[in-house]
Amino acid sequence: MKCIVLAAGYGTRMQGLLGDVPKALVPLGRQVLLDALMQRLALLDLPTYLVSNSRYYDQFQAWQAKARWPIDIIDDGSTEPANRLGAVGDLAFAIDRLDLNDDLLLLAAD
């Protein structure tokens, strides 16, 4: 089994509150929301992949460099809400890009 974490949304409804920060990287106490998810996922010891969009990809890479969670981050290529793939599209993208042929645990990053 492998895990895919979907984090390629643009948070348009939260934009005024978050600025240009993905919802998954919003502070939650001394960590960010995604850290809380990864702490729980670490107990399962599954290969884990996060699907980001192009706008937030670098922010997720910077988070990973500091947090050092074992997760592969892939960019779905979308650059704005108008060309986003959507949840099902991002899932299909990840399965195809990573050539996955296994059971999957699918999670939303937020």
Label each residue range with its predicted role.
Residues G19-A24:
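Short alpha-helical oligomerization interface
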Residues K2-V5, R13, P27, Q31-A108:
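Conserved N-terminal catalytic core of the sugar/cofactor nucleotidyltransferase
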Residues Q15-L17:
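Glycine/threonine-rich flexible loop motifs
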